[in-house]
Structures are given as C-alpha cells and as structure tokens.
Swiss-Prot record:
Loss of function: phenotype: Cells lacking this gene do not grow anaerobically with DMSO and do not show DMSO reductase activity, but their growth in the presence of oxygen and at 50 degrees Celsius is not affected. SAMP2 and SAMP3 cannot complement the samp1 mutation. tRNA thiolation is not affected.
GN (gene name): samp1
Sites of the Glycyl lysine isopeptide (Gly-Lys) (interchain with K-? in acceptor proteins) crosslink: G87
UniProt source species: Haloferax volcanii (strain ATCC 29605 / DSM 3757 / JCM 8879 / NBRC 14742 / NCIMB 2012 / VKM B-1768 / DS2) (Halobacterium volcanii)
Domain of life of the organism encoding this protein: Archaea
A molecular function (GO) term: protein tag activity
A single GO BP: protein modification by small protein conjugation
Name by which UniProt lists this protein: Small archaeal modifier protein 1
An example Gene Ontology CC term for this record: molybdopterin adenylyltransferase complex
Length: 87
C-alpha cells in the first residue's frame, strides 16, 4: 500500500511517497499505524497525546475522505494532508 505525504509530513518522513506492508484485511487505521511504525517522527504530527488522530489531519483513500476504520484493498492509494494555508 502506498501513502502520499504532503507539506511538513513529507519532510518529516523524508519522502513524498512511502510504501507500507499491511494484511489483506487491513483498515486505513492499520495502514496509518504501519506508516507511523516505519517513520516514528510522524506520530507527534498526526496523533495527539490521547492517541487520537488530530482533527486537522485529513486522511484520503483513493482521493476521497476516509475514516480510520474503513477497509482497504490492494492497490489503494492513501494520503495524509496537514492543514495548508497560503498567502
């Protein structure tokens, strides 16, 4: 499964794309756990002290908003977007 990372999340991980291995019945949350396991510095950027995903982090599956409990399928593209502002 491939994650696309944007803005400071890509900088922290050292790459805009990260492949993770997950079981066939994995959820988006399982894939996110695998991503954070491979890149522990991401944990404080996406999860609060309570272990919950920050409200300002957007998780997408195949270009659509995704819940962490949502099932994944082979070939899915997942993405993490931090808040983005511009001027």
């Amino acid at each position: 499964m491939e994650w696309k990372l944007f803005a400071d999340l890509a900088e922290v991980a050292g790459s805009r794309t990260v492949r993770v291995d997950v079981d066939g019945d994995a959820t988006v949350g399982d894939a996110l756990d695998a991503l954070v396991g491979a890149h522990p510095a991401l944990e404080s950027r996406v999860f609060g002290d309570d272990g919950e995903l920050y409200d300002h982090i957007n998780v997408l599956r195949n270009g659509e908003a995704a819940a962490l409990g949502e099932a994944t399928a082979a070939g899915d593209e997942l993405a993490l977007f931090p808040p983005v502002s511009g001027g």
